[in-house]
């Protein structure tokens, strides 16, 4: 069977890793890891593989950072603007993190080449970053190191948030819900983080987004000084100036994001509601379905698959952890109906209650979620024309004996929905 992935000009050396990937050129390296492009032997797909020296991570105390990165990416891997994690493998001396290959490289490189971006291009990247971070925050994850060097581009030029090594997961918060670890890159770091007091990770990320948008439009960071103490003073005093070419709406957003007081600082969700942000917005209404599904499933069927330090750091033999990402069985179908979107949502909720599911409705986006045990169903409705709607139905079961359960729940849904369905598709 011919591979669905087109042949790439990437040079692959022929070195085979654990019988699964052919290694190619080195993309980058650090003190304890190096990254190579590689090709999957089974599919032909290009991926990036981060090869981590286990002993060096132990010696430098970096293993918690690796665990955070893997666990955050695992939880967020369905958002189109978060770099996807495919699998984790390990040997006695190495950890192999296999992720999506971002052929466009770092956004930082593009900024160096062009100096600054026009407002339309800057807005597109900012929209994608805000969408990804909003998704992270709804799952209780703060990135804490947002900067162009950690934002990659795929071959279509879409932004991919990467490097979750400094991220904070929900379980890292103290009893008052705040974070206390000072981290990040100084020029992008919020003043409350610098002050080393408890802080809200989402608000700290919002500050970094303000710096990011300024950098895209101006071509330089708003707070810059060779003396780090002087730079921190500027950050606390909001001491910066806008170049003349930045528009008033963009200035307003940046100013509100760069509010030294986190209590009054604009949130990322508030930014997403502004006219400036929504101009030329390319995100499809259908895109949210996968995000809603995974968030709903995470709440309904808490998985015990969290990757532990023992799993990765203390391994004494080869191990393929790809199963962590293959435990869910999905089935989906689309139908049209000559009723209102509200009627479809109402009907789906009634079906859920009848079949013994817990029902959650997200009215503003016409999404209804049904949960029972380790099964989640999501129905998302979009009005296609007056009196005609299109609905996506997804059933997911997480666990070992999932095939029969998926078919069982699927059959029940089909029968109950027939009353309103005009026609089924795919």
UniProtKB/Swiss-Prot annotation:
Catalytic activity line of the entry: L-seryl-[protein] + ATP = O-phospho-L-seryl-[protein] + ADP + H(+); L-threonyl-[protein] + ATP = O-phospho-L-threonyl-[protein] + ADP + H(+)
Residues annotated as catalytic: 145 (proton acceptor)
Region (PPI): 330-359
Modification Phosphoserine occurs at: 167
Domain of life where this protein originates: Eukaryota
UniProt KW Chaperone keyword: no
EC numbers, comma separated: 2.7.11.1
InterPro entries (alphabetical): Kinase-like_dom_sf, NAF/FISL_domain, NAF_dom, Prot_kinase_dom, Protein_kinase_ATP_BS, Ser/Thr_kinase_AS
Sequence segments annotated as region (Activation loop): 163-192
Example GO molecular function: ATP binding
NAF domain: residues covered: 302-326
Keyword set, alphabetical order: ATP-binding, Kinase, Manganese, Nucleotide-binding, Phosphoprotein, Serine/threonine-protein kinase, Transferase
Protein kinase domain residues: 21-277
Phosphoprotein listed as a keyword: yes
Residue list for modification Phosphothreonine: 181
Enzyme class, broadest EC rank: transferase
Record: residues binding ATP: 27-35, 50
Cofactor or coenzyme needed: Mn(2+)
PANTHER family: CALCIUM/CALMODULIN-DEPENDENT PROTEIN KINASE KINASE-RELATED (PTHR43895), PROTEIN KINASE DOMAIN-CONTAINING PROTEIN (PTHR43895:SF33)
Function statement: CIPK serine-threonine protein kinases interact with CBL proteins. Binding of a CBL protein to the regulatory NAF domain of CIPK protein lead to the activation of the kinase in a calcium-dependent manner.
Free-text comment about domains: The activation loop within the kinase domain is the target of phosphorylation/activation by upstream protein kinases. The PPI motif mediates the interaction with the ABI (abscisic acid-insensitive) phosphatases.
Subunit structure: Interacts with CBL2 and CBL3.
Family the entry assigns: Belongs to the protein kinase superfamily. CAMK Ser/Thr protein kinase family. SNF1 subfamily.
Name of the protein in its database record: CBL-interacting serine/threonine-protein kinase 4
Lineage: Eukaryota, Viridiplantae, Streptophyta, Embryophyta, Tracheophyta
């Amino acid at each position: 069977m011919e591979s669905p992935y087109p042949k790439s000009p990437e040079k692959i050396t022929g070195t085979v890793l654990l019988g699964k990937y052919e290694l190619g050129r080195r993309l980058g390296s650090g003190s304890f890891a190096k990254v190579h492009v590689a090709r999957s032997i089974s599919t032909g797909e290009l991926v990036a593989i981060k090869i981590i020296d286990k002993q060096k991570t132990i010696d430098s105390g970096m293993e918690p950072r690796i665990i955070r990165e893997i666990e955050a990416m695992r939880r967020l891997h369905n958002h189109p603007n978060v770099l996807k994690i495919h699998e984790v493998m390990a040997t006695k001396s190495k950890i192999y993190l296999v992720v999506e290959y971002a052929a466009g490289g770092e956004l930082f490189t593009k900024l160096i080449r062009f100096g600054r971006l026009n407002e339309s291009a800057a807005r597109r990247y900012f929209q994608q970053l805000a969408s990804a971070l909003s998704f992270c925050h709804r799952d209780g994850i703060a990135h804490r190191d947002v900067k162009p060097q950690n934002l990659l581009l795929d071959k279509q030029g879409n932004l991919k948030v990467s490097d979750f090594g400094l991220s904070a997961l929900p379980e890292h918060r103290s009893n008052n819900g705040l974070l206390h670890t000072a981290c990040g890159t100084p020029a992008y770091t919020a003043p409350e983080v610098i002050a080393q007091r408890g802080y809200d990770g989402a608000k700290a990320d919002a500050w970094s987004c303000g710096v990011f948008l300024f950098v895209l439009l101006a071509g330089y960071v708003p707070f810059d000084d060779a003396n780090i103490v002087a730079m921190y003073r500027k950050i606390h005093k909001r001491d910066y100036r806008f170049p003349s070419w930045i528009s008033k709406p963009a200035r307003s957003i940046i100013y509100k994001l760069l509010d030294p007081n986190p209590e009054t600082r604009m949130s990322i969700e508030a930014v997403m509601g502004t006219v400036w942000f929504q101009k030329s917005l390319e995100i499809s209404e259908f895109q949210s379905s996968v995000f809603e599904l995974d968030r709903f499933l995470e709440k309904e069927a808490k998985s015990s698959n969290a990757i532990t330090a023992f799993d990765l750091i203390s391994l004494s033999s080869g191990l393929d952890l790809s199963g962590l990402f293959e435990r869910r069985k999905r089935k989906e179908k689309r139908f049209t109906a000559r009723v209102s979107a509200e009627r479809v949502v109402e009907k789906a909720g009634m079906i859920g209650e009848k079949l013994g599911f817990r029902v959650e409705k997200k009215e503003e986006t016409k999404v209804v979620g049904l949960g029972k045990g380790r099964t989640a169903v999501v129905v998302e409705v979009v009005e296609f024309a007056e009196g005609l709607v299109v609905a996506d139905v997804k059933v997911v079961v997480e666990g070992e004996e999932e095939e029969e359960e998926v078919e069982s729940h699927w059959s029940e849904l089909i029968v109950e929905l027939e009353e309103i369905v005009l026609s089924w598709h795919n």
